[in-house]
Structure formats: structure tokens, C-alpha cells
């Protein structure tokens, strides 16, 4: 719920890069690590996010939203050590799980899903395609909606390593 409040009331956008810019978070790209998708850290009270330059634009958006989730939900942990993500959509680590739900809720509007599912000709992958969402990100979104009391059938399990492919 926090991501919706942030987006709608304070920043007025779903774009994690725009939100981080408004929050004065320094965002950069790195080609230093081949397997690391992104990481965030705090130094001298400034928050930094680094995203792999090897990723597609779609993956960069997802990683940025995921790292923003860490910044908003787990800020106190940033003071201790960088938060690194070499595999997104990890279901075993609670902080990663929370950042994944945050990213899905930030990037995909509840109303867009409600509108799209009214179309009986649209299957799960058609829904993903129509909303420019990966099937894995959509799984997190539908799981989030289900946790909030809306009934959606999830035809695929949440995969913890889909960006590792």
C-alpha cells in the first residue's frame, strides 16, 4: 500500500527513476559486474542506486523499482551494508520478497488489471503483453491483489530467478 501512497500523493508517477530523482537519490549504471542486477547503498547520508548496464530497458525499470522498494521499506538496513540483487524475485528472503511486491505494485496499476480482465478473450500472457509486464512481475502483482482480497487466478508460480536467465 505504501508504494501507491508514494506514487499517487507525493510523486504522481509510476516511474521509479522519476521518483528517485525527486527523492534526490543518485542513480547510475555500472558494467563492473556481469551477474549483479543492481544494488543500493547509503554513504554520507546520500542514497545511491547502481543498475547493471547489461540489462534491457524493461529489466532496468524493474530493477529500479525493486531497489526503490529497498530504499523505502528497508532504509535502516542500507546504513549497515549495500543491498545487492543478483537474482530478482527471490521468495525465500523477506526483504527481497517485499521489494518484489513493491516493484510489482508500483509498476502495474490495480485499475489497469481490473479493466483488462473484463476482456474475456484475454489470457494471462495477453494480460502481461497488454500491460507491458513480464509474466513473473505480473505473478507478483496478482499475488499482491489476492493478498488484498481480490480474487485472481495465477496460472504460473512466482519464479525467484527469472532475471537470472
State where each predicted segment sits.
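Active-site hotspot residues in diverse enzymes, especially metal/ion-binding acidic/histidine motifs
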Residues: 1-165
Amino acid at each position: 500500500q505504501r508504494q501507491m501512497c508514494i506514487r499517487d500523493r507525493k510523486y504522481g508517477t509510476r516511474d521509479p527513476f522519476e521518483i528517485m530523482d525527486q527523492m534526490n537519490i543518485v542513480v547510475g549504471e555500472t558494467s563492473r559486474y556481469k551477474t549483479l542486477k543492481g544494488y543500493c547503498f547509503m554513504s554520507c547520508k546520500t542514497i545511491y542506486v547502481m543498475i547493471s548496464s547489461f540489462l534491457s530497458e524493461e529489466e532496468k525499470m524493474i530493477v529500479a523499482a525493486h531497489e526503490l522498494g529497498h530504499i523505502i521499506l528497508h532504509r535502516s538496513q542500507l546504513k549497515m551494508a549495500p543491498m545487492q540483487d543478483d537474482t530478482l524475485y527471490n521468495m525465500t528472503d523477506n526483504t527481497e520478497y517485499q521489494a518484489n511486491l513493491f516493484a510489482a505494485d508500483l509498476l502495474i496499476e490495480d485499475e489497469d488489471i481490473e479493466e483488462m480482465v473484463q476482456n474475456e478473450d484475454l489470457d494471462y500472457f495477453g494480460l502481461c503483453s497488454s500491460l507491458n509486464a513480464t509474466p513473473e512481475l505480473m505473478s507478483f502483482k496478482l499475488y499482491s491483489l489476492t493478498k488484498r482480497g481480490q480474487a485472481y487466478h495465477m496460472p504460473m508460480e512466482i519464479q525467484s530467478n527469472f532475471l537470472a536467465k
